[in-house]
Design a protein with these regions (language model features):
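Conserved P-loop NTPase nucleotide-binding/switch module
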Residues: 1-66
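NTP-binding/hydrolysis catalytic cores, primarily Walker-type P-loop NTPases
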Residues: 51-122
């Protein structure tokens, strides 16, 4: 889905797609609930002025706030100035559990703040 950010995708773009079905009558909360149940991780790919594309955000969808709005937690963000990908300190517990359920180990130290990750090459 083309969107400016993970939040823009969840709050604007997907609800617009729902509105294309004239026979459907979904509330904002029901759309948010469906997104929360179906999407665990959002990967934001951005195009840079030189034409290159890079991952600029990896964001967890972590259920709903009391207000009915989706709870989004950035896990990794790309620093355009330093040209590095860095952890925010948020650990995606649900995603990690699902990965481990498939027998794959996850080193949780990658989620520590101030541990720069290598630049992701597109």
């Amino acid at each position: 889905i083309h969107a400016n950010s993970p939040r823009n995708m969840c709050d604007v773009r997907i609800p617009i797609l729902y509105s294309y079905d004239k026979n459907a009558d979904f509330s904002e909360k029901s759309i948010a609930l469906q997104i929360a149940e179906a999407v665990q991780i959002i990967v934001q790919l951005s195009r840079f002025p030189d034409g290159s594309r890079k991952i600029t955000a990896i964001t967890e969808v972590d259920g709903l706030e009391n207000s009915g709005k989706l709870r989004l937690n950035d896990i990794f963000l790309y620093d355009r100035q330093k040209k590095i990908f860095h952890a925010t300190g948020n650990v995606p517990k649900t995603a990690i559990r699902k990965i481990r359920d498939h027998g794959i180990s996850v080193d949780e130290t990658i989620f520590q703040i101030n541990v720069p990750k290598e630049e992701i090459k597109a």
